[in-house]
Amino acid sequence: MKERQREKQRTTVSIYGQQYTVAGYDSPEYMKEVAAEIDAKMRELRKVNPYLDTTRLAVLTAVNVMDDLKKLEEYIRYLEQQRLTGDEKNA
């Protein structure tokens, strides 16, 4: 699990050719890693949707990332339920 800082740190990241200053309790390395993943996702989606403007591309990226997150949350709930069911069977 990643280590969180006690104080907010600012760092500059690059996403799709734009520089952004972000602040958070996570390390600058972690924030840059997150930004790099967003950048990669935007570039991946650009290949499939070459005519989207940057704003629409960013929204499409956000929708895709949220979809991934929701599916992972659902899978975690499923695994937790399986673990609980397994614990009941072993009791």
Curated annotation (Swiss-Prot):
Principal subcellular localisation of the protein: cytoplasm
Gene3D superfamilies noted in UniProt: 6.10.250.790
Gene Ontology BP annotations: division septum assembly; FtsZ-dependent cytokinesis; septin ring assembly
Keywords noted in UniProt: Cell cycle, Cell division, Coiled coil, Cytoplasm, Septation
GO cellular component: cell division site; cell septum; cytosol
The keyword Cell cycle belongs to this UniProt entry's keyword annotation: yes
A Pfam family matched in the record: ZapA
Domain of life: Bacteria
Keyword rRNA-binding recorded: no
Subcellular locations according to the entry: Cytoplasm
Residue ranges that the Swiss-Prot or TrEMBL entry lists as coiled coil: 62-82
UniProt subunit comment: Homodimer. Interacts with FtsZ.
Family: Belongs to the ZapA family. Type 2 subfamily.
PANTHER family for the chain: CELL DIVISION PROTEIN ZAPA
Role, per record: Activator of cell division through the inhibition of FtsZ GTPase activity, therefore promoting FtsZ assembly into bundles of protofilaments necessary for the formation of the division Z ring. It is recruited early at mid-cell but it is not essential for cell division.
Name of the protein: Cell division protein ZapA
Organism of provenance: Halalkalibacterium halodurans (strain ATCC BAA-125 / DSM 18197 / FERM 7344 / JCM 9153 / C-125)
Source species taxonomy: Bacteria, Bacillati, Bacillota, Bacilli, Bacillales
